[in-house]
Amino acid sequence: MGKKILFILSVFISANAFSQVNGEAEPPHISMDSLFKIKEKESIGKLFPQFNSTFNGRIITKDSLRGKVVFINFWFAACPPCIAEMSALNELYKKFSSNKNFEFISFTYESPARIILLKKKYSIKYKVASVTRQECYRLNQNNGFPTSIVLDREGVIHDLFTGGDIEDKKEAKDFIISMVYKSINGAIMKQ
């Protein structure tokens, strides 16, 4: 047992000595963005979890959306990047809302009364459901906010986009048009 501890300790000391430059050790740097990209890749191709929520008085479940491409957005009011993308999301909704094979929904942990005020304030046109914070995280794969997910017709995650650093409306719009629009279009065109 003592030899194992001595061996592990010597490996640790050697590794530490070799990792130093000019006497200063530098810890490995992993950005949050790269962690989100890893999580995004892990989620793509997996079934989206079951849910049962009320949107505008209508109960919607994952199973009730089968056969449609679904865009799901997760947000909350105190999130500047979430607010920055709302105008672009309204445009996205307008672009695809007439397609009977497409559904646009969003989840927030804001109260139903607050949702009514926010929909008016930001002219939100798409469906918004109030769920618990825990449910938001469960459904958005434990990502931050905003998170947008595109599901294919079978309820499989086709694409996942995590935000957080875009607070400018134009940047948010450019991102949504360049990435999200293409993803939705690709999922719709895929048979």
Can you annotate each of these PLM segments?
Residues 83-122, 133-138:
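Structural microenvironment flanking redox-active thiols in thiol-disulfide oxidoreductases
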Residues 20-50:
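N-proximal helix/coil linker or "cap" segments that precede and/or mark the start of modular domains
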Residues 49-70:
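A short beta-strand-turn-helix
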Residues 1-24:
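Bacterial Sec-dependent N-terminal signal peptides
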Residues 105, 116-154, 162:
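Short, internal strand/loop/helix patches
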Residues 150-191:
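Thiol-/selenol-based redox modules, centered on thioredoxin-like
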Residues 68-70, 75-78, 111, 144:
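Short pre-active-site segment immediately N-terminal to redox-active cysteine/selenocysteine motifs
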